[in-house]
UniProtKB/Swiss-Prot annotation:
Pathway: Glycan metabolism; osmoregulated periplasmic glucan (OPG) biosynthesis
Function comment: Involved in the biosynthesis of osmoregulated periplasmic glucans (OPGs).
Name of the protein in its database record: Glucans biosynthesis protein G
Keywords annotated in UniProt: Periplasm, Signal
Gene3D superfamilies membership: 2.70.98.10, Immunoglobulins
Residues spanning the signal sequence: 1-22
GO annotation, biological process: beta-glucan biosynthetic process
Cited InterPro entries: Gal_mutarotase_sf_dom (IPR011013), GH-type_carb-bd (IPR014718), Glucan_biosyn_MdoG/MdoD (IPR014438), Glucan_biosyn_MdoG_C (IPR007444), Ig-like_fold (IPR013783), Ig_E-set (IPR014756), MdoG_OpgG (IPR023704)
Family in the record: Belongs to the OpgD/OpgG family.
One GO cellular component term noted in the UniProt record for this chain: outer membrane-bounded periplasmic space
Major subcellular location class: periplasm
Species of the source: Shigella dysenteriae serotype 1 (strain Sd197)
Listed Pfam families: MdoG (PF04349)
Keyword presence, Hydrolase: no
Length: 511
């Protein structure tokens, strides 16, 4: 009897011990809250000049030795590899492993890397740190680990699903984006990564965010698959007042496309990581905003309460739309943010920045709350980000969606059948969708259109498109002042029934 009591006590002690210690976002939040109450300490670079001053081609020579991947000798589907410091990745981040019983720092060693032709003194790099890390997982085939997550630089991270290649990025937080005061880029200064079990299909990552005016604690649960979904929880604390807080920011690139053709001859018809901002507003409306590469900074704001979702999408997957064998823009994912709970009043904001080439991310989208708490008070945001190539499920299932937007010189067909430019700009917008395809060809589909004070709609026509089994809107617009932007909206209806999402377009200035 005494032996049974002793065994019971031992079992209870074991259960208590294993359940009483568990790392959580609250452990990170304590650090973030403590940091918020102190003055900001800028990170110090410990990088030798040979690495700090190197060119990108040299930095690319520094490769992680795949044979030394972290967890390589463990029966887990996830593996970790690390980024070396170099160029503007000049400050180290701390990376920790979380097990069932402890937290252990993953120490830097130059032995993890091959340096190619980069000459360096081993003694000068022995005490460096990592610039970031990547996660590998057998997402495309069971016998091969492929990279699915990259966390490198500021609070940026990139994620892909099966059959995808890296494109747009997500971020932890954006501060004062597009404001005259200049943008502040918070950075993840420390990570904690839970060691996965052999049967785990998800990976949990915690991160501590820091910047001059904000700190934060983050929990990312990565669920790889055909679509890779990242479940995000954040606790944010302001050190000082900010002009604008960008929550769940997405960063992408748009250089040119059919709504804004390339000014120079280019064999690629389109060049972009994303071609539109999609919004599912709190009132149920779906909005599609084609992206631009403007000549001047452009900011668009969509006010609403409790957004149901937003994302930067890559609509149109045919290779013929891109014709790029090297960069495979047709395989780059869309990213869709789904808020959890009520986010209150605020705006989905789109920032479009001029760029001359595809190496610059010039598109940013995020949620910005109308009201921010006083410094030190906690803000909580929960959401998922879905990285997908299946855009069919990223719009209203019962409404038509915009398949493409094309811009052209407006013209009128003369009696001799020759088209004569009439000083207008023509927009050709194709709508399609599963429900729309069921409509008879003679359905009296019309368009509800509107334009801002800087323009006039000269003509608007809708006709059936037998190729897409949808309807095509052609709208000819006259701009009053080319130095100003021109806003326009359109949606397809049948009597009092709305058939499509709302096409919302901004014609940039000086176009």
């Amino acid at each position: 009897m005494m032996k049974m009591r002793w065994l019971s006590a031992a079992v209870m002690l074991t259960l208590y011990t294993s359940s009483s210690w568990a790392f959580s976002i609250d452990d990170v939040a304590k650090q973030a809250q403590s940091l918020a109450g102190k003055g900001y300490e800028a990170p110090k670079s410990n990088l030798p000049s040979v690495f700090r001053d190197m060119k990108y081609a040299d930095y690319q020579q520094i490769q992680f030795n795949h044979d030394k991947a972290y967890w390589n000798n463990l029966k887990t589907p996830f593996k970790l590899e690390f980024y070396h410091q170099g160029m503007y990745f000049d400050t180290p981040v701390k990376i920790n492993e979380v097990t069932a019983t402890a937290v252990k720092r993953i120490k830097y060693s130059p032995d993890y890397f091959t340096f190619g032709d980069v000459r360096h003194d081993k003694d000068t790099v022995k005490d460096l740190g990592f610039a970031g890390f990547k996660v590998l997982y057998p997402i495309n085939s069971k016998d091969k680990n492929d990279e699915i997550v990259s966390m490198l630089g500021a609070s940026y991270f990139r994620v892909i699903g099966a059959g995808q290649v890296y494109g747009l990025s997500a971020r932890g937080l954006a501060i004062d984006t597009a404001l005259p005061s200049g943008e502040e880029f918070p950075r993840f200064k420390e990570f904690w990564i839970e060691r996965p079990k052999p049967t785990d299909k998800r990976l949990t990552i915690y991160a501590l965010l820091d910047s001059p005016r904000a700190t934060g604690a983050y929990k990312f649960v990565v669920m790889p698959g055909r679509d890779t979904v990242v479940d995000v929880q954040s606790k944010i604390y302001l050190r000082d007042k900010v002009g604008k807080l960008g929550v769940a920011p997405l960063t992408s690139m748009f250089l040119f496309g059919p709504n804004q053709p390339s000014p120079a001859n280019n064999y690629r018809p389109e060049l972009h990581d994303s071609n539109g901002l999609s919004i599912h507003a709190g009132n149920g409306e779906w909005i599609w905003r084609p992206l631009n590469n403007p000549k001047h900074l452009a900011v668009s704001s969509f006010s609403m309460e409790n957004p149901q979702g937003f994302g930067l999408l890559q609509r149109g997957r045919d290779f013929s739309r891109f014709e790029d064998l090297d960069d495979r823009y047709d395989l780059r994912p869309s990213a869709w943010v789904t808020p959890k709970g009520e986010w209150g009043k605020g705006s989905v904001e789109l920032v479009e920045i001029p760029t001359n080439d595809e190496t610059n991310d010039n598109i940013v989208a995020y949620w910005t709350p109308d009201q921010l708490p006083e410094p030190g008070k906690e803000m909580n945001f929960k959401y998922t980000i879905t990285f997908s190539r299946d855009e069919d499920k990223l719009h209203a299932p019962d409404n038509a969606w915009v398949q493409q937007t094309r811009r052209s010189t407006g013209d009128v067909k003369q009696s001799n059948l020759i088209r004569q430019p009439d000083g207008t700009i023509a927009f050709v917008v194709d709508f399609t969708g599963a429900e729309m395809k069921k409509l008879p060809e003679d359905t009296p589909v019309t368009a509800q259109t509107s334009i801002g004070d800087n323009g006039e709609i000269v003509e608007s026509t809708v006709r059936y498109n037998p190729v897409t089994k949808g309807w095509r809107l052609v709208m000819r617009v006259k701009v009053k002042d080319a130095k100003k932007t021109t806003e326009m909206r359109a949606a397809l209806v049948n009597a009092d029934q709305t058939l499509s999402e709302t096409w919302s377009y901004q014609l940039p200035a000086n176009e």
